[in-house]
Amino acid sequence: MSLARNLSHRTLAWGAVLLLWVGFVWGHSLVGGAASSAESGRVVALLRPLFEATGVTDLDLMTFIVCKCAHFSEYAVLGGIARAFWSRVSRELGSRASSSRHQVLLAGLVLTALVPCLDETIQLFVPGRSGSPRDVAIDLAGAATGALLTWLFRRARTRER
């Protein structure tokens, strides 16, 4: 509990948002295969005119693209939230020595990278679902993109001041 006492309320709020988002991601992984396919089907039906306008007419390909974009997107959000949280923790707990700050950021990176690994493991135990190393790679790419975009946004805002 002493760790939490050393963090600001704003940082703790970012931590809560991060935990809620991880819960959302893992909760989504607990949805059975049939329900997950139905959800993807609804999105495909909505986007079908856009797919067809770009020359994509294969329904399986549309579904594949929607599913992989969903993976990427939910992890881009996770990456952005995680970057905000771990950067704040690093600033608040890390000493002035950059090695301490880097250790905090490295711990955050490792913990964030474990989320998609556990996500795909969860899916191994859900009827109609499967875990995939390819999905872990897509998830990690999404998280990295989200972290990069939020870092760039913060950097641009800091330069404006």
Which residues does each predicted region cover?
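Bulky hydrophobic segments
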Residues: M1-F125, P133, L140-R161
